[in-house]
């Protein structure tokens, strides 16, 4: 019997380079075959240049998040612990520029869509409904599912209470 293929997914790193190192070491020790990151590398108390070096060193497949986009376009620099392009090395800037909004990775024999929000919309969210926020149909998610490339995705949801 073939060994199970294990995918580790991390996100919202926010330049926490020390915690990132601990997390990656933990995942590797758990036998994770491939690690992917859903973005938001920027804007945190840690060192973004070091964060990028760690991701590259560990060959982490990464996409951009909204904070990464904001950093590159000089938007929302008022957020707490915002990074600024002028304080980063060129390798970090080039790396952030190279990150796609979405990426399809092969996980074992299955394609997996990696993104920060929903598809190329890095601020889109999906979560179960509550009385204050009912589940809403997402035409963008429907489009992704209708493409048929990700057979594990389903739009079936339940809004009933137990």
What is each of the regions a protein language model found here?
Residues 83-98, 102-162:
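Acidic, His/Gly-enriched loop-helix segments that form or flank divalent-metal centers
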Residues 2, 27-32, 107-108, 147-149:
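Glycine-rich phosphate-binding loop signature in dinucleotide/nucleotide-binding domains
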Residues 4-98:
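Core catalytic region of metal-dependent phosphoesterases/phosphodiesterases
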């Amino acid at each position: 019997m073939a060994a199970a293929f294990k995918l580790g997914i991390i996100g919202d790193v926010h330049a926490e380079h020390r915690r990132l190192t601990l997390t990656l070491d933990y995942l590797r020790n758990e036998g994770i075959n491939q690690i992917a990151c859903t973005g938001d590398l920027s804007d945190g108390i840690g060192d973004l240049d070091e964060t990028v070096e760690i991701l590259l060193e560990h060959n982490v497949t990464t996409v951009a998040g909204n904070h990464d986009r904001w950093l590159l376009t000089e938007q929302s620099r008022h957020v707490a612990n915002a990074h600024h392009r002028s304080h980063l090395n060129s390798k970090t800037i080039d790396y952030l520029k190279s990150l796609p909004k979405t990426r399809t990775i092969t996980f074992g024999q299955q394609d997996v869509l990696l993104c920060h929000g929903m598809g190329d919309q890095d601020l889109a969210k999906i979560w179960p409904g509550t009385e204050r926020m009912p589940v809403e149909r997402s035409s963008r998610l429907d489009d992704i599912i209708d493409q048929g490339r990700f057979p594990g995705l389903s739009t079936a949801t339940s809004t009933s209470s137990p």
